[in-house]
Amino acid sequence: ATPYVWVQGNALRSGEPVWIPREFVYYSENPSFERWALGTSSGCATGSSVAEATVFGLLEHIERDTFVNSWYGAIPAVAVDPGSVPGVADMLARVSLLGWRVELGLLRNVWHIPVFVAAIDTGTVRAYGAAAHLDLNGAAERALTEAVTYAPGRMSEVAEKADRVRALIRDPREAQNIDDHPLLPVAGGRSEYAYLYADPACAVPIDVVRAAAEGGSAILQRAGASGGRVVAAALRDELVATIERDGIETFSVNQSAPFQHRLG
């Protein structure tokens, strides 16, 4: 039998070394050994330090977990007015000039950490973006930015895969993998793909949902945030402790390449 391959990492709570399946770390490989887990880039992040990158990686896991649970569970998002988000007025003006429609919704999780999903409707396809951040406004801005960034690519993809799109419109059960899912919310598709399980007509200002996502600000306070500054390691430790209170263990592997180490 072909030996299974493991990579050494660390438990974030204790710092103890642990063994991680290789495909969780080097997820773009085609290994010679039989895989028993599907590796993805979920949880991969960069930062100005290992601690900061770890914080962003954990937040991405929270984003993906919240998004998928809401999607599969059809858990309603809380519709939020994109125009009430600070710092995005110029981007929304550009979106309006293009004739696109934008929606934003707060997705809820057990930690009350802010996670937003945004949708851009170009008229031919809907592009989605999602983001988690400890700051409520920061999470909303990042979700909107991601959706806007994805929109041109989604338009090109739908045009290039027109035959596949028509087949999925006829029968969405034909969807086979993750590449098919972005082709479902298109013009002529089923109405259930048209919204974020929230009515845009009921959108509220972002400050109204602040109490439903206060977990992020609580973590910042416990980590000693002062004057907008916080030590990344303290933030990492508070985030890890918050997650592990629900019995979820967290691990990390430093993926930095040698040339990245040389660059600092």
Q: Predicted regions span which residues?
A:
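Helix-biased "structured C-terminal domain" signature
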Residues: 1-264
